Amino acid sequence: VDPALVEAPLGHRLWKHEMFLPILMLHRVANRDEAMRLANDSDLGLTAGFYGGVDEVPWFHEQIEAGVTYANRKQGATTGAWPGYQPFGGWKGSGSTGKAIASFYYLAQYQREQSRTVVEP
């Protein structure tokens, strides 16, 4: 599938469904707050990207509802789990446990806890 830029009405299904295709949806907005509201108006939240100034990047990371976020990332950079460097997991309907693969907390969900008490005679 060739990459595509698509401008479609906000009610179009491409706005609400994960396609895993090289499609970038376009919609004109009045300001960044409107853009963020539209970005977060989704039942999904795997990845999100942003291009902006140094002063805008912290705002983006605090506001976006996605598990893997990028700011000012150049084309061709990887998206994926790098153990010890980049956990990979989605929020909302894009995740199931809230714990990302390769995160500090991921392995613990597969471990069994056991409390042991020994009273010496």
Features from the language model and the residues they span:
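Conserved C-terminal structural/oligomerization subdomain of aldehyde/semialdehyde dehydrogenase
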Residues: 1-121
